[in-house]
Amino acid sequence: MSPNGWIILDKPLGLGSTQAVGAVKRVCREAGLGKVKVGHGGTLDPLATGVLPIALGEATKLCGRMLDASKVYRFTTCYGIETDTLDLEGKVIREVDSVVGIVDDAAVEDVLARFIGPIEQTPPAFSAIKVDGQRAYDLARAGAEVTLNSRTVTIHALDYVESWWQEGKLYATLEAHVSKGTYIRSLARDLAHAMGTFGHVTMLRRLKAGPFGIEQAISLDKLNEVGKGAPLENVLLPLEAGLVDIPALNLGPEQARAIRQGRVLAGLPHTDGLYWAKAGTVPVALVELFGGTATVVRGFNLPDVAE
């Protein structure tokens, strides 16, 4: 039986999100599971580590929902230097000799409150955004001048963690809870500019993506154990683990049959909103309730659904 559910990978440094998906596919083949549909719920740059939700089977139908979810990151900024990529990988384009007397711990903490809530943010030139059909990072690497439009994103929370001095540069680690579409590299740049200096990201770790936290994440070594004979169940979370942030709608056998056939259910005594409908413990579909009527948003083809 083909697996359906989530593997939450603690993505290591240097591994791309597409490579991580490839690693899961390889492990499934090695485990004798055959060809498994696999997708990820939110790109994480190779220079970033942490939570990368990887969907298997029917859970891939929820990848789009995961992309729209908010994220939590911990990141370190080096103040006094800005690079073209806004991280360690790039070429230095702006620099000051020292930030002593310009930036200190208090300045970092003081500026955070100004960035809470909806803000306008310009994405990095080195990003996956498409410009006239081409990725911005491809154009930037080719030497083209890339100008991206600003966008409105939301910073739900921004907290100071720690800071230290090294060779005349201040390093500060912050934790940010952000909406979809937020670039942490741009946030670090803009925070530095607000302090009157420059900055680039030296460490980026995703602690949470949607309902999934770092405490649920497994290492690449743990994943590889599945390819060597360990049970997939050791690392696979159920499909409904990606739905814990919305309420469940319990269905009887006839209701489950109707939903699986794409029909609407009327006369339900529930408030309007998004629900995941289930028959027993088995997810049947995502449904939208309005005026007591449930309409299928996305159906799941899972075994043991009441017929």
Short names for language-model regions:
Residues 152-172:
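Helix-hairpin-helix/helix-loop-helix acidic hairpins
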Residues 1-47, 69, 171, 194-307:
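Accessory RNA 3′-end/elbow-binding domains used by RNA modification enzymes
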Residues 65-123:
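Acidic, low-complexity central loop/insert segments
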Residues 37-67, 138, 142:
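Glycine/acidic-rich beta-strand-loop module
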Residues 54, 75, 133, 187, ...:
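Residue-level signal for inorganic ion chemistry
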Residues 126-127, 131-156:
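Extended alpha-helical targeting/anchoring segments
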